[in-house]
Amino acid sequence: MTPIVRFESVTKTFSSGKKTLTAVDAVDLTIERGEIFGVIGYSGAGKSTLVRLINGLERPTSGRVVVDDVDITALSESKLRHVRAKIGMIFQQFNLFRSRTVAGNVAYPLVVAGWPRQKRRERVAELLEFVGLSDKARAYPDQLSGGQKQRVGIARALATSPDLLLADESTSALDPETTQDVLRLLRKVNRELGVTIVVITHEMDVVRAVADRVAVLAEGRVVELGTVFDVFSEPQAPASKSFVSTILRNRPEPADLERLRSRFGGRIVTADVRDGSRIGDVLSDAGGHGVRFEIVYGGITTLQDRSFGSLTLELVGPDDGVDDVIRRLRTVTDVEEVQA
């Protein structure tokens, strides 16, 4: 893959009186053409500023932003408009014109671009069919559900056939079921149209559902960058660990361990699970050592066709047998025994 967006030592500061706020701090980042790239961070992490730097709505204080091999940092406003014509944008609050029909909203970028009326009609019909709203062409936004409004927003963003789609908290105002519908549509946009998508979010579930790679932002800096599988399965930065813990509770917390120790009389161990770790082979042989086991906590997650997680086990049997099972587990994965 080749880059479609590059941040080269980009810093963006804002001044308020005598105070200076650093919203984006020395960011180096490459987004590859054709991928779905997630940017996640808590409120104030710099996510929205980052996306505004991509479409030139903000200029960096220092560094370069390169979009489709064009350094947009010092472009004039007129030249920036040509770059923005290849960038679509969808928003949290949809930003539809209430006085225009669904078809009118989708057609708006084409009107601005000077498309002839008949070509506009054909393109709008094509897009509404793509997003599953052909029957809503004459409806108005107030007659639509939240999910339908976002579908209109996606169709409008695709009107001029952009190479890059920026989705800024595009599912934050939706219920969980509708969120999944919209995410499926974004995957369809990426897969069938080849559009690169940058998903800005504070929800790790969104990243897990659609992204190929993810950057974790904290205080304006990229504190972790990698495939979604790597960041989920082995988060390194405190911010990454915090996000992952909100949706994956594979390892017991101290309070959970206290409860497990009081409930189960055997020895308690937590073993990491990775593809090919062969934990099952070790456990299937445990009976031969006079040891029985029970899974008392944990879970396995499949992501990008790979599995990871952890299992907390009670091992019951003679000490030498349990010791041997733990020793064998440690030859295939990381194991931590809970001390009594």
UniProtKB/Swiss-Prot annotation:
GO cellular component, one term: plasma membrane
Residue ranges of every copy of the ABC transporter domain listed in the record: 5-244
Keyword Heme attached: no
Subcellular location: Cell membrane
Gene Ontology molecular functions: ABC-type D-methionine transporter activity; ATP binding; ATP hydrolysis activity
Gene3D superfamilies registered for this protein in UniProt: 3.30.70.260, P-loop containing nucleotide triphosphate hydrolases
Reaction catalysis annotation: L-methionine(out) + ATP + H2O = L-methionine(in) + ADP + phosphate + H(+); D-methionine(out) + ATP + H2O = D-methionine(in) + ADP + phosphate + H(+)
Keyword annotations: Amino-acid transport, ATP-binding, Cell membrane, Membrane, Nucleotide-binding, Translocase, Transport
Binding site for ATP: 41-48
Primary localization class, coarse: membrane
EC number(s) recorded for this UniProt protein: 7.4.2.11
Name under which the protein is recorded: Methionine import ATP-binding protein MetN 2
Source species of the chain: Rhodococcus jostii (strain RHA1)
Organism phylogeny: Bacteria, Bacillati, Actinomycetota, Actinomycetes, Mycobacteriales
The encoding gene: metN2
